[in-house]
Each structure stands twice: as structure tokens, then as C-alpha cells.
UniProtKB/Swiss-Prot annotation:
EC numbers: 6.3.5.3
Protein name stated in the entry: Phosphoribosylformylglycinamidine synthase
Lineage: Bacteria, Pseudomonadati, Pseudomonadota, Gammaproteobacteria, Vibrionales
GO molecular-function term, one example from the UniProt record: phosphoribosylformylglycinamidine synthase activity
Binding site for ATP: G307, A308, S309, T310, G311, S312, G313, G314, E315, I316, R317, D318, A678
Subunit structure as annotated in this protein's UniProt entry: Monomer.
Gene name tied to this protein: purL
Functional note: Phosphoribosylformylglycinamidine synthase involved in the purines biosynthetic pathway. Catalyzes the ATP-dependent conversion of formylglycinamide ribonucleotide (FGAR) and glutamine to yield formylglycinamidine ribonucleotide (FGAM) and glutamate.
Reaction catalysed by this enzyme: N(2)-formyl-N(1)-(5-phospho-beta-D-ribosyl)glycinamide + L-glutamine + ATP + H2O = 2-formamido-N(1)-(5-O-phospho-beta-D-ribosyl)acetamidine + L-glutamate + ADP + phosphate + H(+)
Length: 1302
């Protein structure tokens, strides 16, 4: 083993945060220094040349001052016996760089801890707990001890459970020790069946059975028979859900039987490379819509980052594994937790009710979990466009008496939508003899028993089993697998996949039997053919672990050659682990021990286990009305704006890429001031169409404490009032996912669940014409623990989260909450605000945000009293949206009318005057009730026609003209002549932002968080704006395109790159012939660059950014003789041009020694905020010789920014001056007044002199961090000025490239 020192691992503010944590625990630590340590496992000694190459490879990241460390060494490394994603990717790079001597690389972090006194053993343990994740890491106290990382242990054998001698008792003991969560009748079932077989079960068989038959996988409660209040019920819960499909099957292509549901989409030109020529082209066909929403609550409670990350990853796999290959497209995440209690910002309603030690508190869940979910989506390359966040934790009198209700077991929702070809919606038959394949990463000893563990109440299982059930993520691996699936479905009728499932709960022990069973086959498997990174694992651990990023497939023998070629090109590992058999029998052979750990008929594993029967009793709640004493409207407004459910969510949004794909038509951020208040998420179906897809969410979970049915109806209603803001048309085009969370078995909750399912499945959805073709249930939403001998519990309310999906006719019609004034819309004229109140003046306050911030529950909650009226509302809004009658639209939800109008004013940067006299005499109830409805802004010229449309749909009595919009800072509610509330809009905007600021300051660089917060106090901020030196609607490439010649453009990608398709689309539109080129094509000689005139290196996360962003990719070129020669020759050909964007920018900057005129280029390193930044940032084109920016100097326009490592790093001031003097700076960040800026977030990464793009001395090669290819269409811009046509301003760059060739 060779040890190589790396660069410092922690910036100054990260060290300070760690020291602060030490102080909080009274640890006498005075200083901490950390640096990376690299360990190389070698086949033989390195010669000098190889050592120099390896040292260069392992020099990466920002330059932080090094010093000779002192103090106690604590070396954090991956757990011995495991291979980290960092290790596998960096080893790949080393091998691609020709370092064949390297068997494996691994990385640790050496912490040197200085203290005022010698630390005791307990204190050292406390420091260790702060610096490592015990699930995946270990701590050594000397560097040499890291050799344990490379020791290979002996495999453990299979174990038996002796039921033939020990009977039922033996299985009961195994049930506890293995954490199987088997029910009594399942234990009887297993004893009976194995006794019949005349043999003892192996532990692996029992674990496999437990996973396959867990509540998590089998949904026993939803399939159970029910008796309520002594009366047998006709239908199971699942039957009532299916009733929605039986009533309204319209537009549903697949429901209840696959990994995701499918509905009909639009006929569009899907843009992807021709499988033979690899040239990108449009394929005119149906792009059907697939949809799925998952929960990952249990793992997120135990370990938030990986819990949320693998939640998103699993849901993405569900989409990819739909039919015989789908394409994930856009994502959503949602969180419900107990109160945050932010240190120093605790709120009056936040009481501390305690928690068990094994789960994480709500604050840490929300500091870490969202980062995990965002990081997976970012690295995979899926925009995250939607979400919600609710906090609830209170002692209330509910139907079960006085108790604490809250979310110590959080809800973590991960969902999304994608597209699928018509011929791929249904799975095919699995032929006998088909290869049964595991595609993706290796088996690791993590995530054991996740299905069974998540089916128990938090705190019931042993702590080590809880931790064992958490998984770890490697999104770049999943991206590679998805690229394989993409290449397969792009073959159309020749798609080699016959059957596919994702690997989720229960690992391959669930996925492979399910694959065989669904394909009506058996399977014969070889245990030692399963790719395995921990050789010491027992058969149970290999077969049942939940290692992520894996799919199981069936491929006919005659298609294996094509499948193998695709996997090699995409560098996606796979293994044939078995063969499909005619007989429905499952066999698993182990060549190492020469035995058969599994040998059982399929019908014992997945057969008719006993059906559950639930007995339930209805309990009614008697809760008093809200006590008004001491509630002042002004203070109520402030409190409600600080409630996390209502407060600004920027800290949850800018961490997630919202522009990747170039197909995003509506993200969360709205208008020139980029305020996060969008009603719904919208994507375009392709680059040649305005058809698209939309997603929205609805949930009102605290209402279930008063009325189960109302809570469920409101969730459906809110999803509709949100999605009504876009152009859907017929309500039957909308399909819902229903995610049900319940503390099953808690007094009154089972009957309540039945009531809620009936309310939507049998009543509301059929009345509206809505279908629920997909969903999930999580039936153990309770946390129990002991504290000082007292048993405690926190029980969640019944929680239904609805996600609505719909096909969009025209994405341009989407209306946002941004109020318009003549400042933002020329020639606007007078406008009015109209409230449509679906509560019909009832103004009920039960379980509202207002009630919560005063520690109350109230009596009657809002409800959907009239389904016909709700449908009329949707139809009316669709008419008005389609006919361009609405300037602004915002649904009424948490926080009521007050919050609806406040958010509209924040987005419009304007004032509001509203008179609420005709809405009721109780001003508090009028302002803060959460009845369904919406506020719209309309031109006074259109007011009569809008009101008559509302009346024609039965809404006349509940439609009220309530006020006007003003270009001012005044936010005023009156009731006749009486002023009810008069505030500064800016002041309210700042209060609304406090929560996001506090969370950002705790999690990211606090200096950046403070700058962003300060900027929100500036009422004079003009917002995003555009100033162009050219005509955006002129196509300067048109004359060259007309000639018919198409110059050849290499669209270059490496493993982990995810922005290549939109880049190809932009160059294709500009008249180029765009060709898909993977780095593996170059390294294997399948592609040569001398055939191309242009080359573009695309954005993403090459090699997961393990050796610095873009650095691994660059080094695999620099240190590979053949690749180096090709690239050098290309850059030296004078007729060529090149572009590097984001990851491609980072990569080309590291190739500068090969690029003429690039010698001054800087490096790009970690953002100053130390966070991935997804922003819509204003930039100005500088005067330079770049062929891309010809005629654009002085132009100022916004652009998509999405990166974690975009900060320009120069050697010193002299280097920076030389760059400026050379005239090669091509782009700078500017503020909204047009000045180059260092202020965050206008300068999202802290680059000196606001530099974000450079070119070479002759202008042939340009690099830039922002993404022009994602916003080349006007509809793909988060905000664009009126008057832009189909092409956005950034399309000019690509047209310039075409014009330059002539």
C-alpha cells in the first residue's frame, strides 16, 4: 500500500462549524485541521514516471493553505471490506490513464485535533461521532492502519433455523434476531410449508420471504378485509382506489401492475441519436407520460442525506424500469417533519417533546435530507421542479384523547414523471432460457432488511438493525444504467429488454423472484456471479442487501451481444446471474461452499400467505373552537409567515438543478425577482413543440386530526387548484398519485384511514372524473421510546399526499402568481384582483396555520363541500388560462388569503389594496381560513368576460372583486372604511425569508446566506432585465442552413455527463449535424475527432466529480497517449472551434496545455457558498474574439446556472491582471443594475471580477460555467421579457457558430 497526501479537506468556515459543535458538547478542542489521504493498493511498485502521474492525478480541488499537522490523528475512511463510489470511480480514471499497476485507490480524511488538555476516551469518541458516519465509515488512529481497507476476508457460510427439531419457537427466535417482522400467521405458514418440504429453512430463505411479504412490499393493510364498528365492509382499501380507474379509465395505459403508471401523452418529435449513425435527430411519435411517487420515511429518520438521496434514486429507477424501458424526466421532493426549533430562532409554538436517540431531529433532517435528495437528482441529471415542506408537532386533544401528534418519523416524498414509447408500455414475455441480469453497481453490506424495518414503528426494532437498513447512493452509476436503458428503448422494435424491474426493498432477493414471477417463470441463479464488493458477506447478505443503483432484466440469448455492446460503451457494469426456467421454482447455488442456499417452489415464497383482516372502531373528536384571546392580526401575520409550512423555501430549491434537459417550462422560481411561489411544475414534451406535462401537489395533513375525510378531500382539491394554472383542458387528462401515511393500529386511525380512502376513491374522484392509477402506503407512522423510565410516543396524523400529473396542451399558457404593474408590462392599464372562494364564506379555521402558530387545533376545518363546484372552478380556470384572460393566478392554501396575496405581491414586487368587507365580518377568519380557491389578476377591460365565465361555471356567488395592484410598497387590507392590516410589502417579504436565511446560514457559508438575506431588503432592486445588442427574433444562421450543408459537430460526453441532449438540440437548430460521442468511443477508436469541425464538451458530473470537477475527465485525456494526441490535433486545426460548458468548461480548463492561446485560463473550484448553486443569473457578454459571441458584446441577459464548483481560481493578483489584459474574458456576472458584482447570489460562486466565461486568444475555443443550451428556447427561461419569439437570446451563440463556418 502506498500513502499519498492530498490537499486540505476543510475550508475555514467548515472548520469553524466543527469547532462550534465541539464547544456545544463541552469538548476542550482548540483547533482542527483536516486533509485528504490517498491509499493505493498496487500490483507492484510504481516507477518514477508512474508515481509522478499518480501524484498529478490525486492533486485536485481548491487551493487551501497547507500546514504540517499537529495534534491527535483521527483518520476517517470507508468501512474496511467495502469499496466506496469514490474508490471505484477514481480507480476507473487511473486505469483509463494507463496506470495498470494500480489495483485500487481509496481515500480517507485525516483530522488532526488539538486540545487544551488530553482528551479522555469518552471525549475522543464524541469527536469521532462528529466527523464520521458510522454506517459507512470507520476511524483509525494511525495512517498505516488503512491497509485494512485492502484486506480480503473469507466469506461467511449460510445459517439454518432448526424448525424440524425446535418447531415454532426456533422461528420465533429467528424472527427477532434477524428483524424479520413476520406476523403470527406468517410464522405458522412457514413452519407448515417447510415441515411439508421435510427440511429446515436457511436464514437467506427466511429473510427473502420476510422482505417479499413485508407490509412495505405486499401492502397487506390496503389489501385486507375490514370490519368497522362491527359491520363487514364490502371493499378493501385498494379496491376503493381501483374504483377510480373503473369509473374513469380514460387516458390510462398502465395502472397498478408496474413500477410506475402510464397515461397518454402528446405526439411530438422526440430528440435522440439514431442508434446506427449516432446522429441526433427528431423521431415523431407518442411520448406517453409515466408517473410515480415514493416515500422513504424510515431511512430518512435514521440517516437523512442517504435516506432522502436513495429515496429519489429508487423512484428514478422505478421510472426507468417501467414497461421495457422508460425515460425519467422531472422530479419532486417533499418533507413533513416535527418542529425545527432553529437555535436562537425558536418560535412560540415550538414545544420540545423529546425524541429517541436513534433518530435524527427535525432540524438535522431538514439540513441534510434535502441536500441528499437534491444531490441525487443533480448528479443523475433530472431537474427537481416541485415540492412541499410542512412542520407539525403539538399536544392536542384528538379522537384518541390528549396526545402528542407530529412527525418524529418524517415523511420524505420522492416522485417524478417521465416519458415512454407506445410500444414499450407493456412488458414482454420472458423466454425460457433468457439471461437474468443484474445491471449496475455491486452488492455491499448495507440496507439489510429495509422493507421489514420500514414496516415497523420507529423505535421498535434493535438500533443496529435500524442502522443496517439505511442505504448509500451513487447517482453517477445510476446515470450510466439509465444511458443503457435509453440506448435499448431507442432501438424501438429491436429493444433487447424483454422484462425489467428496479432493485429496491429487499434487494435482489425481492427483485429477481419478482422478475421471474411476473414473467411467469422460475429461475436458477448462481450466488457467486452476483457482483460483490464485500467478499466477506454471507449468502444472506449478498442476496438480501439493498445496495442501490441496480436493475434486474431478462434478455433473450440472441440479444445478449447487442446488450453487451451497449453496456461496454456506457461503461455500465452488469452480470448474468441466472437463467429463466419453465418450472416455477427458485434455486440459488453457491459455488464457494458447493451448496444450495435457496431451493423452494415460487408459490411458497410468493404464494397465498394468510390474508389480513382488520377490525376498527370509529372515534370522534371533540375539539373546541380557536380561542381568540390575545390574537392580534398584525402579530398573527408575522407568525404565519415564519411557520416553515408557509415561509420561503429558497434553501430547499436553489440546491437543486432546475434547468437540466432544457425542457423545463415552469420551475418554482417566478418572475424577474425569482420568488419561489409557482403553482405547479411544467415541462415541454420536446424541443419542437409546445405540448408538455405538468405536476402539482396537494396535502393538508393536520386537518386529519379533526376530520379524516376532509383532509383527504382537501389534498385532492389543492392538487387541482395548483395544476389549474396551466393549460390542461379536460379534467380527465389529470391522473393522481396517492401516498398514504398512517399510524396503523393507533386508536381510531384504522377507521379514519378507511373513511379517507372511501372519501376520495368512492366519492370525490369519481365525481370529478379523476383517476388514481399509482400510489404507495406507509403504515407505521409512529415513534416510541423510553425516557427516564417513562414511555413516550409521537404519532403522526393520517397523511395523504396527492400528486397530480397532466398532459399540457400549450406550456406557454401557464400563469404564475407574479402580479403585474405597468412597470413590468407595458401599456397594462387598470387591473383588478378577483377571489374565487370555494369555501363559500364558511371561513373555517380548524387545523390552519393560524391555529398551529397559537398552539391550537380548533374545531371545524375547511372541506370540499361540493365536488360539482370544484369541477366548475377547474373548467372555468382552464377556459380563462387558454384564452389569455389571467395576468396572475395563485391558489389559496396554507396561511389563507393573507398569504396568497402576500406571495403574489412578493413575486410582483408591488403593492396590494384589498377590501374584504363582503367576505365576512370576522376579519381574522377571512384572512387566515384555508378554504380552497384562488386569486386572479385580470385587466379591467376583461373583467366582465372573466366574471361571466366564472358565473357560467356555477361560481357567481363565490367570486368577489376584492381589490387592486399598485406599483408601491403598501400591502393593505381594509373592510369598508376600516383598515384591517397595513404593512410594508418589503418588511413582510423579509419576515417570510427569515426561516430560509437561518437554515442557509446553519448549513452553508453563513457570509453568503447573510448577503442573500440583505439583498431581499432592497425595495429598489429592479429585478432581472434584458438589454441586447442584437435582434433576438432574427435568425442569422438561416442563410447558411438554406444552403443545405451541415457542418459536423461532436457532442462529447463522459460517464456522468448529463447535459448532452439539450446541447445537441441547440446545435441541431443552428444547422449542425450533431453526433453523440462518448469518451469510450475515442479511447476504443470507434470515433475520431478529425472528422469534425466543432466539438462541445457538455455539462454534468463526469466520474461523479471524484477527482475535482472535470479534472478526472481531463486527466483521462492528458494521461492517455492516444486520446491526448487526438485532442491536441483537433485544437491545432485552424478551421475547428470548441465550446466547454459547466463540467465541460472545467474539463477544457484542465486541458489548457493542449489548447493554443489558453495558457492564462484559470481553474474552476468549489463555490464560495460551498453548495451546489442552481440560479437564473444575469450575465453580460464582454468584448472578446470568441466566435460564439460575435456581435453580442454589451448584451445583458439571464442564463441558467447549475454547479457546485464554478469559482474561478487564479494563482495571484498578477495572474488575474494578465487575464484581464489579454481580452479573453467573455462573460461576467452582473447585478440587476448591470454592474459586475461580487455579491451573492448575483455572483453565485464568488468568482473574482465576476468572471464566468473565457475564450482563447484567437476566439476559437470558449469555456463558460453557465448553460446557454438549457435556455435556447424562450419557453425554457424561468423568466423572459415579452416579445421574444420561439428562440431565446442565447440561441444567438449557436447561430454565430454556424455563421462563422460560412
Amino acid at each position: 500500500m502506498r500513502i499519498l497526501r492530498g490537499s486540505p479537506a476543510l475550508s475555514e468556515f467548515r472548520v469553524n462549524k466543527l469547532l462550534e459543535l465541539c464547544r456545544e458538547q463541552d469538548l476542550p478542542v482548540t483547533g482542527i485541521y483536516a486533509e485528504f489521504m490517498h491509499f493505493a493498493d498496487l500490483k507492484s511498485d510504481l516507477d518514477d514516471q508512474e508515481l509522478e502521474k499518480l501524484e498529478k492525478l490525486l492533486t485536485y480541488g481548491p487551493t487551501i493553505e497547507e500546514h504540517e499537522p499537529e495534534g491527535l490523528l483521527l483518520l476517517v475512511t470507508p468501512r474496511p471490506g467495502t469499496i466506496s463510489p469514490w474508490s471505484s470511480k477514481s480507480t476507473d480514471i487511473a486505469i483509463n490513464c494507463g496506470l495498470d499497476t494500480v489495483k485500487r485507490l481509496e481515500r480517507g480524511t485525516a483530522y488532526y485535533v488539538e486540545s487544551s488538555v488530553v482528551l479522555s476516551e469518552a471525549q475522543v469518541d464524541a469527536v469521532k461521532a462528529l466527523i464520521h458516519d458510522r454506517m459507512m465509515e470507520t476511524v483509525f488512529t494511525e495512517l498505516e492502519a488503512a491497509s485494512a481497507l485492502f484486506t480480503v476476508a473469507e466469506p461467511k457460510p449460510v445459517a439454518h433455523v432448526d424448525i424440524l427439531a425446535g418447531g415454532r419457537l426456533a422461528l420465533e427466535e429467528a424472527n427477532v434476531s434477524l428483524g424479520l417482522a413476520l406476523a403470527e400467521d406468517e410464522i405458522d405458514y412457514l413452519v407448515e410449508n417447510f415441515t411439508k418440504l421435510g427440511r429446515n429453512p436457511n436464514d437467506i430463505e427466511l429473510m427473502m420471504f420476510a422482505q417479499a411479504n413485508s407490509e412495505h412490499c405486499r401492502h397487506k393493510i390496503f389489501n385486507a378485509d375490514w370490519t368497522i364498528d362491527g359491520v363487514d365492509q364490502e371493499k378493501s382499501l385498494f379496491k376503493m382506489i381501483k374504483n377510480t380507474f373503473e369509473t374513469t379509465p380514460d387516458h390510462v395505459l398502465s395502472a397498478y401492475k408496474d413500477n410506475a403508471a402510464v397515461m397518454t401523452g402528446s405526439k411530438v418529435g422526440r430528440f435522440f441519436p439514431d442508434p446506427k449513425s449516432r446522429q441526433y435527430t427528431y423521431h415523431h411519435e407518442d411520448a406517453h407520460i409515466l408517473m410515480k411517487v415514493e416515500t422513504h420515511n424510515h431511512p430518512t429518520a435514521i440517516s437523512p442525506w442517504p435516506g432522502a438521496s436513495t429515496g429519489s434514486g429508487g423512484e428514478i429507477r422505478d421510472e426507468g424500469a417501467t414497461g421495457i424501458g422508460g425515460k425519467p424526466k422531472a422530479g419532486l421532493v417533499g418533507f413533513t417533519t416535527s418542529n425545527l426549533r432553529i437555535p436562537g430562532f425558536e418560535q412560540p409554538w415550538e414545544t420540545d417533546f423529546g425524541k429517541p436517540g436513534r433518530i435524527v431531529n427535525a432540524l438535522d433532517i431538514m439540513l441534510e435530507g434535502p441536500l441528499g435528495g437534491a444531490a441525487f437528482n443533480n448528479e443523475f441529471g433530472r431537474p427537481n421542479l416541485l415540492g412541499y415542506f410542512r412542520t407539525y408537532e403539538e399536544k392536542v386533544t384528538s379522537h384518541a384523547g390528549e396526545e402528542v401528534r407530529g412527525y418524529h418519523k418524517p415523511i420524505m416524498i420522492a416522485g417524478g414523471m417521465g416519458n415512454i414509447r407506445d410500444e414499450h408500455v407493456q412488458k414482454k414475455e420472458i423466454p425460457v432460457g433468457a439471461s437474468l441480469i443484474v445491471l449496475g453497481g455491486p452488492a455491499m453490506n448495507i440496507g439489510l432488511g429495509g422493507g421489514a424495518a420500514s414496516s415497523m414503528a420507529s423505535g421498535q426494532s434493535a438500533e443496529d438493525l435500524d442502522f443496517a437498513s439505511v442505504q448509500r447512493e451513487n447517482p453517477e452509476m445510476e446515470r450510466r444504467c439509465q444511458e443503457v436503458i435509453d440506448r435499448c428503448w431507442q432501438l424501438g422494435e429491436e429493444n433487447p429488454i424483454a422484462f425489467i424491474h428496479d432493485v429496491g426493498a429487499g434487494g435482489i432477493s425481492n427483485a429477481l423472484p419478482e422478475l421471474c414471477d411476473d414473467g411467469e417463470r422460475g429461475g436458477k441463479f448462481q450466488l457467486r456471479d452476483v457482483p460483490n464488493d464485500e467478499l466477506s458477506m454471507s449468502p444472506l447478505e449478498i442476496w438480501c442487501n439493498e445496495s442501490q443503483e441496480r436493475y434486474v432484466l431478462a434478455v433473450a440469448p440472441e440479444n445478449m451481444e447487442a446488450f453487451d455492446a451497449i453496456c461496454k460503451r456506457e461503461r455500465a457494469p452488469y452480470a448474468v446471474v441466472g437463467v429463466a426456467t419453465e418450472e416455477r421454482h427458485l434455486t440459488l447455488e453457491d459455488s464457494h461452499f458447493d451448496n444450495t442456499p435457496i431451493d423452494m417452489p415460487m408459490d411458497i415464497l410468493l404464494g397465498k400467505t394468510p390474508k389480513m383482516h382488520r377490525e376498527a372502531t370509529t372515534l370522534k373528536v371533540d375539539s373546541p373552537a380557536i380561542a381568540r384571546d390575545g390574537i392580534e392580526i398584525d402579530e398573527a401575520a408575522d407568525r404565519v409567515l415564519r411557520l416553515p409550512t408557509v415561509a420561503e423555501k429558497t434553501f430547499l430549491i436553489t440546491i437543486g438543478d432546475r434547468s437540466v434537459t432544457g425542457l423545463v417550462a415552469r420551475d418554482q422560481m417566478v418572475g424577474p425577482w425569482q420568488v419561489p411561489v409557482a403553482n405547479c411544475a411544467v415541462t415541454a414534451a420536446s424541443y419542437d413543440t409546445y405540448h408538455g406535462e405538468a405536476m402539482s401537489m396537494g396535502e393538508r395533513t393536520p386537518v386529519a386530526l379533526l376530520d379524516f375525510g376532509a383532509s383527504a378531500r382537501l389534498a385532492v382539491g389543492e392538487s387541482l387548484t395548483n395544476i389549474a394554472a396551466t393549460d390542461i383542458g379536460d379534467i380527465k387528462r389529470i391522473k393522481l398519485s396517492a401516498n398514504w401515511m398512517s399510524p396503523a393500529g393507533h386508536p381510531g386511525e384504522d377507521a379514519g384511514l378507511y373513511e379517507a380512502v372511501k372519501a376520495v376513491g368512492e366519492e370525490l374522484c369519481p365525481a370529478l372524473g379523476l383517476t388514481i392509477p399509482v400510489g404507495k402506503d406507509s403504515m407505521s407512522m409512529k415513534t416510541k421510546w423510553e425516557e427516564n423510565g417513562e414511555s413516550k410516543e409521537v404519532t403522526s396524523p393520517l397523511s395523504l399526499v396527492i400528486t397530480a400529473f397532466g398532459r399540457v396542451e400549450d406550456v406557454r399558457k401557464t400563469v404564475t402568481p407574479q402580479l403585474r404593474t405597468s412597470d413590468t408590462l407595458e401599456g397594462l392599464g387598470d387591473t383588478s384582483l378577483v377571489l374565487v372562494d370555494l369555501g363559500n364564506g364558511k371561513n373555517r379555521l380548524g387545523a390552519t396555520a393560524l391555529a398551529q402558530v397559537y398552539k391550537q387545533l380548533g374545531d371545524k376545518p375547511a372541506d370540499v363541500d361540493n365536488a360539482e363546484q370544484l369541477k366548475g372552478f377547474f373548467d372555468a380556470m382552464q377556459n380563462l388560462v387558454r384564452n389569455d384572460k389571467l395576468l396572475a393566478y395563485h391558489d389559496k392554501g396554507d396561511g389563507g388569503l393573507f398569504v396568497t396575496l402576500a406571495e403574489m405581491a412578493f413575486a410582483g414586487h408591488c403593492g396590494v389594496k384589498a377590501d374584504i368587507a363582503e367576505l365576512g365580518e370576522d376579519a381574522l377568519a377571512v384572512l387566515f381560513n384555508e378554504e380552497l380557491g384562488a386569486v386572479v389578476q385580470v385587466k379591467n377591460d376583461d373583467l366582465d368576460s372573466v366574471l361571466s365565465t366564472l358565473a357560467a361555471n356555477g361560481l357567481e356567488a363565490c367570486s368577489h372583486v376584492i381589490g387592486s395592484v399598485e406599483a408601491s410598497d403598501d400591502f393593505v387590507f381594509t373592510s369598508g372604511d376600516d383598515v384591517v392590516l397595513k404593512r410594508s410589502r418589503t418588511e413582510l417579504r423579509v419576515i417570510w425569508a427569515e426561516t430560509t436565511h437561518k437554515m442557509q446560514a446553519l448549513r452553508d457559508n453563513p457570509a453568503c446566506a447573510d448577503q442573500e438575506f440583505e439583498a431581499k431588503k432592497d425595495n429598489t432592486d429592479p429585478g432581472l432585465n434584458v438589454s441586447l445588442s442584437f435582434d433576438v427574433n432574427e435568425d442569422i444562421a438561416a442563410p447558411y442552413i438554406a444552403k443545405g450543408a451541415k457542418p459536423k459537430m461532436a457532442i462529447l460526453r463522459e460517464q456522468g455527463v448529463n447535459s448532452h441532449v439539450e446541447m445537441a438540440a441547440a446545435f441541431d437548430r443552428a444547422g449542425f449535424e450533431a453526433t453523440d460521442i462518448h469518451m469510450s468511443d475515442i479511447l476504443t477508436g470507434q470515433a475520431v475527432l478529425d472528422e469534425y469541425q466543432g466539438l462541445v464538451a457538455c455539462g454534468g458530473f463526469s466520474y461523479g466529480d471524484v477527482l475535482g470537477a472535470g479534472e478526472g475527465w481531463a486527466k483521462s485525456i492528458l494521461f492517455n497517449a492516444q486520446a491526448r494526441e487526438q485532442f491536441q490535433a483537433f485544437f491545432n486545426r485552424e478551421e475547428t472551434f470548441s465550446l466547454g460548458v459547466c463540467n465541460g468548461c472545467q474539463m477544457l480548463s484542465n486541458l489548457k496545455e493542449l489548447i493554443p492561446g489558453a495558457d492564462l485560463w484559470p481553474r474552476f473550484v468549489r463555490n464560495e457558498s460551498e453548495r451546489f448553486e442552481a440560479r437564473f443569473s444575469l450575465v453580460e457578454v464582454q468584448k472578446s474574439d470568441s466566435v460564439f459571441f460575435d456581435g453580442m458584446a454589451g448584451s445583458r441577459m439571464p442564463i441558467a446556472v447549475s454547479h457546485g464548483e464554478g469559482r474561478v481560481e487564479v494563482r495571484d493578483g498578477e495572474h488575474l491582471n494578465a487575464i484581464e489584459a489579454s481580452g479573453t474574458v467573455a462573460l461576467r456576472y452582473v447585478d440587476n443594475n448591470g454592474n459586475p458584482t461580487q455579491q451573492y447570489p448575483n455572483n453565485p460562486n464568488g468568482s473574482p471580477n465576476a468572471i464566468t466565461g473565457l475564450t482563447t486568444a484567437d476566439g476559437r475555443v470558449t469555456i463558460m460555467m453557465p448553460h446557454p443550451e438549457r435556455v435556447f428556447r424562450t419557453v425554457a427561461n424561468s423568466w423572459a421579457p415579452e416579445g421574444w419569439g420561439e428562440n431565446g437570446a442565447w440561441m444567438r451563440m449557436f447561430q454565430n457558430a454556424r455563421k462563422n463556418i460560412g
